[in-house]
Amino acid sequence: MGQEPKGKSDSVANIQSPPPKPTTSPPLSKKESESPPFEKEYISKIVSQFGEDKIRVAYIRPLRTKITVDSSYIIEIATFIRDNLGFDHAESVTGTDYPKDNQIEVIYQLGSYSKEDIAAHVLSLATRTNRDDARLPTLTNVFKSAEYHERETFEMLGVYFEGHPRNDRFLLPEDWADLPPLRKDFRIRGR
């Protein structure tokens, strides 16, 4: 009496034990955060073409670089990247809501099918827009593959892409009248 079947207490102990703490990577040293030669090459081409005042470069990790540009230059810079560097398609378009800054950042992850030497590289092209009147020029005329992704960003974050062929609903119900669901102030009803 009072004894548990063999093995049961072991499984209960395993269920109730806390999960292991996540490990964090140490911060990058200055040397580790510098861009490798290939990334430096295409970054220098972009900066020399448009100037340091129009582009902010953030090296992320090998094969991945992020540049942030003012939205008024995004079409011109995206076209240069496509025509001169060989990044020929938008692999995805993502967005992040920054309510404290009253901004939404939209990031195009650019890749290449046509140039084998950069096929593994991803160039993230980012820009920001005012959250209250979230409008950006479309990049569908530069990267046809951005069409679907911009539609999703329009619907989920409320960013209107000027010149886009179809800024309309396709995932949410047509009568959706609430905030875009990926905005940080969106609340699920009843919670």
Regions found by a protein language model. Name each.
Residues M1-R191:
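Conserved helix-adjacent loop modules within structured domains
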